[in-house]
Amino acid sequence: MKVIATLYGLLFLTVVLGDITEGNENDLVENFREELSEADIPLLKKLEAIEDALLEKDFLPYEEEDRNARPKRCAKVRNWCAKNEDCCCPMKCIGAWYNQQSSCQSTFMGMFKKC
């Protein structure tokens, strides 16, 4: 029973202190607005416009990059290749989907190829 009473007491204090904190924040905002001069208002509007522009820029949809345009690298030999074939025998060099990396994929026909 004491545990339940203690929990109710903590819940009550949390609610009361939360309201007090919110009230203090509102008072601080009102005091800040009173301290602003007429000269500060255009500056604040400029700052808000800059902030809105930055937020809008951050959330613009990005164009998906063409993964075929990325350079391909032979992971086993560690050299860059322009073509998929003859990159790392008996492997085939394929481009990765991210970070411009690539990996070597084993091919059966590549085993009989001369490098």
Swiss-Prot record:
<protein>
    <recommendedName>
        <fullName>Delta-hexatoxin-Hi1a</fullName>
    </recommendedName>
</protein>
<feature type="disulfide bond">
    <location>
        <begin position="74"/>
        <end position="88"/>
    </location>
</feature>
<keyword id="KW-0732">Signal</keyword>
<keyword id="KW-0872">Ion channel impairing toxin</keyword>
<comment type="similarity">
    <text>Belongs to the neurotoxin 06 (delta-actx) family.</text>
</comment>
<keyword id="KW-0964">Secreted</keyword>
<dbReference type="GO" id="GO:0005576">
    <property type="term" value="C:extracellular region"/>
</dbReference>
<feature type="disulfide bond">
    <location>
        <begin position="81"/>
        <end position="93"/>
    </location>
</feature>
<dbReference type="GO" id="GO:0090729">
    <property type="term" value="F:toxin activity"/>
</dbReference>
<keyword id="KW-1015">Disulfide bond</keyword>
<keyword id="KW-0800">Toxin</keyword>
<keyword id="KW-0738">Voltage-gated sodium channel impairing toxin</keyword>
<feature type="disulfide bond">
    <location>
        <begin position="89"/>
        <end position="115"/>
    </location>
</feature>
<keyword id="KW-0960">Knottin</keyword>
<keyword id="KW-0165">Cleavage on pair of basic residues</keyword>
<comment type="function">
    <text>Neurotoxin that slows inactivation of voltage-gated sodium channels (Nav). In vivo, is lethal to both vertebrates and insects.</text>
</comment>
<feature type="disulfide bond">
    <location>
        <begin position="87"/>
        <end position="104"/>
    </location>
</feature>
<feature type="propeptide">
    <location>
        <begin position="19"/>
        <end position="73"/>
    </location>
</feature>
<dbReference type="Pfam" id="PF05353">
    <property type="entry name" value="Atracotoxin"/>
</dbReference>
<dbReference type="InterPro" id="IPR008017">
    <property type="entry name" value="Delta-hexatoxin"/>
</dbReference>
<keyword id="KW-0528">Neurotoxin</keyword>
<dbReference type="GO" id="GO:0019871">
    <property type="term" value="F:sodium channel inhibitor activity"/>
</dbReference>
<feature type="signal peptide">
    <location>
        <begin position="1"/>
        <end position="18"/>
    </location>
</feature>
